[in-house]
Regions:
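Conserved catalytic core of nucleotide polymerization and phosphodiester-bond processing enzymes
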Residues: 1-190
Length: 190
């Protein structure tokens, strides 16, 4: 595997964790990117190639829908927040409500908090625009505060050229180049 070529003389693989590795402030990983190890297939489980040295343990962590949790916090989206508190899988809940596969519901959940419209959704899910709009309408009926937060965040970034994150970090936007549509993703990811 390509990972073998990156091991040191002790057969250890090291990566670089970049604490502010993206413009939005999201953690990133490089050389190699161990945040993007391929998912298991029927043929091969890529993660099985990673083995801890004797006396050590490998740890794998998942943020468990952290972006959706932050979006609920910022938007005061109580309906979804209650589902999270009750241990529900929000992607499965959305899938059931819209009568679609979980993978499509996940795209809608994340798409909505980043401002996806019917045009982009229809392309992502390979469905007609009318159906995409129906999904979005139903979704916004279920979780109306996300639409409110998206509008408020974009207007604030457009007016002031900056947003402040819960960490105190400030993200500046070039208003002249209309980058304020990225304000929501920076708010959630930063």
């Amino acid at each position: 595997t390509p990972y073998m070529k990156m091991m040191d003389i002790n057969n250890t693989l090291h990566c670089s964790l970049n604490l502010i590795g993206t413009i939005s402030g999201r953690l990133s990983c490089s050389n190699p990117n161990l945040q993007a190890v391929a998912r298991p297939t029927n043929v091969f489980k890529v993660k099985d190639v990673f083995i801890a040295r004797a006396g050590y343990t490998l740890v794998s962590a998942d943020y468990s829908q952290a972006e959706m949790r932050l979006a609920c916090y910022y938007a005061h989206e109580d309906t979804m927040a209650e589902l999270i508190r009750n241990g529900e899988d929000i992607h499965s809940t959305t899938a059931e409500a819209l009568d679609i596969p979980r993978s499509a519901a996940k795209r809608i959940n994340f798409g909505v908090i980043y401002g996806i419209g019917a045009e982009a959704l229809h392309k992502q899910l390979r469905i007609d625009k009318k159906t995409a709009q129906q999904y979005l309408n139903k979704y916004h009926g279920m979780y109306p505060q996300f639409r409110v937060l998206l509008g408020q965040t974009e207007r604030y970034a457009d007016q002031y050229g900056v947003i402040e994150l819960w960490t105190g970090r400030r993200r500046h936007f070039n208003v002249q180049h209309a980058y304020t549509h990225k304000a929501m993703s920076n708010l959630i990811q930063g």
